[in-house]
Every structure is written in structure tokens, then in C-alpha cells.
From Swiss-Prot:
PANTHER family: 5'-NUCLEOTIDASE SURE, PHOSPHATASE, PUTATIVE (AFU_ORTHOLOGUE AFUA_4G01070)-RELATED. It comes from Methanosarcina acetivorans (strain ATCC 35395 / DSM 2834 / JCM 12185 / C2A). Binds 1 divalent metal cation per subunit. Its cofactor is a divalent metal cation. Disulfide bonds: none annotated. GO terms for molecular function: 5'-nucleotidase activity; metal ion binding; nucleotide binding. Transmembrane segments: none annotated. It is found in: Cytoplasm. The gene is surE. This is 5'-nucleotidase SurE.
Length: 267
């Protein structure tokens, strides 16, 4: 009888290849199979599922805490595409995107998060995908150097993601689920309760700050405060109010669940 092949796992992120969160993601699945890292060379937060089609991409071999890795001069989606079609040259059994430094909750982040964007790209090929994010208490930490973020903050998340990834590899995804979006609260322990949630509508109260440069010309920062109170059963409520781990099953199919006759009225 032939020897069973170890599962192939691709790891990516949006904070850049040298983020401590990426090393934590590697550690969370390192005992589950043959792990390859393909991640953006630099910070790519907020790029969503964007893809580079007007410029060439380069891949640089590097290492993450002594682990061989590939740094891609592009987005998380680029990193997944090159990881699959150029580096691995085959479909992996699982793609893990994370750990993001900062929570990715609500519909706000599904279309803007590079962490989730990379996972969605993998899911579009039928690959089981997990996006994992770690809550920060100080929103300013999202803009600090991700190489300096405290390694110990990921310990509980590593164990939680390991268990979930192990079961995804063993059983596959449930029907109509393409991606599991996991958010770990800042003070999580291994026994922190886990809640299966739906997406909240919003997590940001969007604002725009106008400032003036030395020549008196206006420039702008997109900003806003976090929404911490949302309906029971949402990811925002679970993470922000209860301090629970949130797991939200996501489908690529964004078609509204309505009778099409409702739209025909507009024709």
C-alpha cells in the first residue's frame, strides 16, 4: 500500500510576509501537512480581492522566522494565484489567510479586507479556505509595524485554528460554505467560548477628516469609530460585546435570496 500524501496547505496574509501574524498562521497548521507561504512583500491591508493585471509581478525567496517563504510583489490575491499556479503548480488542500492584526468582522470587511480577499480567491477554485484575524484593543496597532506585534497574543488563536483546520482537512466544508471567517478576541484563551455567527451590517461609522498641507491645500483621511453594539448572533456582537471567538461561514454566491419577480417589477 502506498504512503499517504501529506495535505498541501498554502498560507498567505495581507499584513505582509514578515508579519508576526503570518508566522502564527504557519504555526497553526505546521503539523497538519506540507505548508507553503506565499504572501505580499509589503503591507496590503484594505486591498480586498484586488488583482494586479496592469503590471508584472515578482516573487522573492525569503524566510519568516527561519521558515522558507515566498514574498510576492502584489496583493494577497496575487499571492494566492502565484502560490497555486507558479509555486505549488497544483491546487492545495487548504488555504489559510492570516492571522490579520485587527478583527475582520461585518460586511464592511468582507469586500475590503485583503486577508479575506486572499481566502475568497482560493475558495473560487473550490479550495477550502480559512481567514483568521486577531482583535486589537488599540486601533492604532493596525498601523504599526506588523513585525513587532506581540507574538504571545496569537497563542490561543493558533490552537483554535489548528483544530478547525484539522477538521476541514478531514471532512471538507459544509455544503454551500466556501470560507470560514474566524475572529479571535484580544483576551482569548484556549477555552474561550466559540459562537457561530452571521455578518453584522457595519462595524465602522465612516468619517472623513480634512486637513491642510503646508501650501494650504486640502487632503483627506478616511477614518471613523468602531461600532461595538450590534444584534445578538452577529460577529460584531460576539467579538465586541461577549469577547467570544466568532466563526462566520461565508459563501461566494452573493445573489440576493428573493423571488426574481420582485426585480421584474422594475423592468
Amino acid at each position: 500500500m502506498g504512503k499517504l500524501m501529506a495535505p498541501k496547505i498554502l498560507v498567505t496574509n495581507d499584513d505582509g510576509v514578515y508579519s508576526t501574524g503570518l508566522k502564527a498562521a504557519f504555526d497553526s497548521v505546521s503539523d497538519l501537512g506540507e505548508v507553503t507561504i506565499s504572501a505580499p512583500a509589503v503591507q496590503q491591508s484594505g486591498v480586498g480581492r484586488s488583482i494586479s493585471i496592469f503590471e508584472p509581478l515578482r516573487i522573492t525567496k525569503t524566510d519568516v522566522g527561519g521558515i522558507p517563504a515566498y514574498a510576492v510583489g502584489g496583493t494577497p490575491t496575487d499571492s494566492v494565484i502565484l502560490g497555486i499556479f507558479t509555486i505549488l503548480k497544483q491546487m492545495p488542500d487548504l488555504v489559510l489567510s492570516g492571522f490579520n492584526i485587527g478583527e475582520n468582522i461585518s460586511t464592511d470587511t468582507i469586500t475590503t479586507s485583503g486577508t479575506i480577499g486572499g481566502a475568497l480567491e482560493a475558495a473560487s477554485y473550490g479550495i477550502p479556505a480559512i481567514a483568521a484575524s486577531m482583535q486589537v484593543l488599540d486601533e492604532g496597532q493596525k498601523f504599526d509595524d506588523p513585525r513587532d506585534y506581540h507574538r504571545e497574543r496569537f497563542e490561543a488563536g493558533i490552537k483554535i485554528v489548528n483544530k478547525i483546520a484539522r477538521n476541514v482537512l478531514r471532512h471538507g466544508m459544509p455544503e454551500n460554505v466556501d470560507l470560514l471567517n474566524i475572529n479571535i478576541p484580544y483576551h482569548a484563551e484556549e477555552d474561550t467560548p466559540i459562537e457561530i455567527t452571521r455578518l453584522a451590517r457595519k462595524v465602522f461609522k465612516t468619517d472623513v477628516e480634512e486637513r491642510r498641507d503646508p501650501r494650504g491645500r486640502s487632503y483627506y483621511w478616511i477614518a471613523g469609530d468602531l461600532i461595538r453594539e450590534e444584534e445578538e448572533g452577529t460577529d460584531v456582537h460576539a467579538v465586541m460585546q461577549k469577547g467570544y471567538v466568532s466563526i462566520t461561514p461565508i459563501s461566494l454566491d452573493s445573489t440576493a435570496r428573493i423571488e426574481f419577480s420582485e426585480i421584474e417589477k422594475y423592468l
